[in-house]
């Protein structure tokens, strides 16, 4: 009798396991296409990474038959004198849209404030907001507002292409063209989004240390390695095979914020004049230009790429950038640059406390595109 009951229980569990396996396989089949597109495509593209980064055939397919001669677009607003006869540590370009006045105002009061950097950090930076023209539907009124804004602040450069996501590479070309023409002596160049936060005291201290050793061939940020082109036509990042035929991009840094040395800026500008700029994903185009001249990006754990950093003094101590800050920009600037932040990790117990807090905040199982877990141990 016991054997009969035991046999029934075994069959019952076998049935449950079979049902579970069937449901699992059915779910896997249903979701396989998006899983395959996301995971498998990354695995495939990463396997091509060495070839893409090491050989010239990628750039050969994108090279122009005739080198571009000068800018294709004219300046509507410009400040040729911005860098003249000055020792510039950092030329900072902020990618912005014509309508984003509030974002520009917040940056002027915080990390983009030249006077603050000069008086408090003993460094000379030049901040410029890079943009195109307003959408035609928004008319001349917004352009008049931009002209008024620039008369007040003298920190906008604008060319006569329409400002849109699909013209981001044109905006990048404008930045490198301006730097090459009007500020070739800047020690470093940085490009950043207008919803980014930059811990300027930490960044300036870092760049000054690099300047002292005469660093060259320098490009740093959050590095994307072996990233595949998006072939999904519903994505705004869609890239056709006609535009880019290879299974992986060269290594590049996230466009949210990255820094290059002045010599790299000059080389990238020259390379940009020889490549087809129809690829509108600007950070990828930057990677193609750098790949052409043999510059390899370096990953910095405190450049957050597209992610927003956790709010905590132990994080602020070494942070460089954090993405996605609008309403909280002023408060974050005040808290992160408070001199007391530098004292929180002093002493044995302070170091232990901050190490534990960073492990708790950064070493999570769920994927968050912010600082990696290894940043907790630096």
Swiss-Prot record:
Give ranges for the Cytoplasmic compartment.
1-14
* InterPro entries named in the record: Glyco_trans_31
Give the bilayer topology: Single-pass type II membrane protein
Membrane side Lumenal: which residues?
36-378
Q: What is its main location?
A: Golgi
| Range of residues in the leader sequence | none
The UniProt record lists the EC number as 2.4.1.206
Q: In which tissues is it expressed?
A: Widely expressed. Highly expressed in lung, colon, placenta, testis, pituitary gland and cerebellum. Weakly expressed in brain, liver, spleen, lymph node and thymus.
Q: Which molecular-function annotations from GO does this UniProt entry contain? A: glycosyltransferase activity; lactosylceramide 1,3-N-acetyl-beta-D-glucosaminyltransferase activity; N-acetyl-beta-D-glucosaminide beta-(1,3)-galactosyltransferase activity
So where does this one cross the membrane? 15-35
Cellular component terms, GO, for this chain's entry? Golgi membrane
Record-level GO BP terms:
central nervous system development; glycolipid biosynthetic process; glycosphingolipid biosynthetic process; O-glycan processing; protein glycosylation; protein O-linked glycosylation
Q: In what pathway does it function?
A: Protein modification; protein glycosylation
The residues that the database entry marks as glycosylated are 59
Q: Which UniProt keywords apply?
A: Developmental protein, Glycoprotein, Glycosyltransferase, Golgi apparatus, Lipid metabolism, Membrane, Signal-anchor, Transferase, Transmembrane, Transmembrane helix
Q: Where in the cell is it found?
A: Golgi apparatus membrane
Q: Which reaction does it catalyse?
A: a beta-D-Gal-(1->4)-beta-D-Glc-(1<->1)-Cer(d18:1(4E)) + UDP-N-acetyl-alpha-D-glucosamine = a beta-D-GlcNAc-(1->3)-beta-D-Gal-(1->4)-beta-D-Glc-(1<->1)-Cer(d18:1(4E)) + UDP + H(+); a neolactoside nLc4Cer(d18:1(4E)) + UDP-N-acetyl-alpha-D-glucosamine = a neolactoside IV(3)-beta-GlcNAc-nLc4Cer(d18:1(4E)) + UDP + H(+)
What is its induction? Up-regulated by stimulation with retinoic acid and down-regulated with 12-O-tetradecanoylphorbol-13-acetate (TPA).
Similarity remark = Belongs to the glycosyltransferase 31 family.
Please explain the role this protein plays, according to its UniProt record.
Beta-1,3-N-acetylglucosaminyltransferase that plays a key role in the synthesis of lacto- or neolacto-series carbohydrate chains on glycolipids, notably by participating in biosynthesis of HNK-1 and Lewis X carbohydrate structures. Has strong activity toward lactosylceramide (LacCer) and neolactotetraosylceramide (nLc(4)Cer; paragloboside), resulting in the synthesis of Lc(3)Cer and neolactopentaosylceramide (nLc(5)Cer), respectively. Probably plays a central role in regulating neolacto-series glycolipid synthesis during embryonic development.
- Check the record and name the PANTHER family matching this protein: BETA-1,3-N-ACETYLGLUCOSAMINYLTRANSFERASE, LACTOSYLCERAMIDE 1,3-N-ACETYL-BETA-D-GLUCOSAMINYLTRANSFERASE
User: What is the designated name of this protein?
Assistant: Lactosylceramide 1,3-N-acetyl-beta-D-glucosaminyltransferase
Q: Which organism is it from?
A: Homo sapiens (Human)
Encoding gene, per UniProt annotation = B3GNT5
């Amino acid at each position: 009798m016991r054997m009969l009951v035991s046999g029934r229980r075994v069959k019952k569990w076998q049935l449950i396991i079979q049902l579970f396996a069937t449901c699992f396989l059915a779910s896997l089949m249903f979701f396989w296409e998006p899983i395959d597109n996301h995971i498998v495509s990354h695995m495939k593209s990463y396997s091509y990474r060495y070839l893409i980064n090491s050989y010239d055939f990628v750039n050969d397919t994108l090279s122009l038959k005739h080198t571009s001669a000068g800018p294709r677009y004219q300046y509507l607003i410009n400040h040729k004198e911005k860098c003249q006869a000055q020792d510039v540590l950092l030329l900072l370009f902020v990618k912005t849209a014509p309508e984003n006045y509030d974002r520009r105002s917040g940056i002027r009061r915080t990390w983009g404030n030249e006077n603050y950097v000069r008086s408090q950090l003993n460094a000379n930076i030049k901040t410029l907001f890079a943009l195109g023209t307003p959408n035609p539907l928004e008319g001349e009124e917004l352009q008049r507002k931009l002209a008024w804004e620039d008369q007040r602040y003298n920190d906008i450069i604008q060319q006569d292409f329409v400002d849109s996501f699909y013209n981001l590479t044109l905006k990048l070309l404008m930045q490198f063209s301006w730097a090459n023409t009007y500020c070739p002596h800047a020690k470093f160049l940085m490009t950043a989004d207008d919803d980014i936060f930059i811990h300027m005291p930490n960044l300036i201290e870092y760049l000054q240390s690099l300047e002292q050793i005469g660093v060259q061939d320098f490009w740093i940020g959050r590095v994307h390695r072996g990233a595949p082109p998006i072939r999904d036509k519903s994505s705004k990042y869609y890239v056709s095979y006609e535009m880019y035929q290879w299974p992986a991009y060269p290594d590049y840094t996230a466009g949210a914020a990255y820094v290059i040395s002045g010599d790299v800026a000059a080389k990238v500008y020259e390379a940009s004049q020889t490549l087809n700029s129809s690829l509108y994903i600007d950070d990828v185009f930057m990677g193609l230009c750098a790949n052409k001249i043999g510059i390899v990006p370096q990953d910095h754990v405190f450049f957050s790429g597209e992610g927003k950093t956790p709010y905590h003094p132990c994080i602020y101590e070494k942070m460089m950038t954090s993405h996605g800050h609008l309403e909280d920009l002023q408060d974050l600037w005040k808290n992160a640059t408070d001199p007391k932040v530098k004292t929180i990790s002093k002493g044995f117990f302070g170091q232990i406390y901050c190490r534990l807090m960073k492990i708790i905040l950064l070493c999570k199982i769920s994927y968050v595109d912010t600082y990696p877990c290894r940043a907790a141990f630096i």
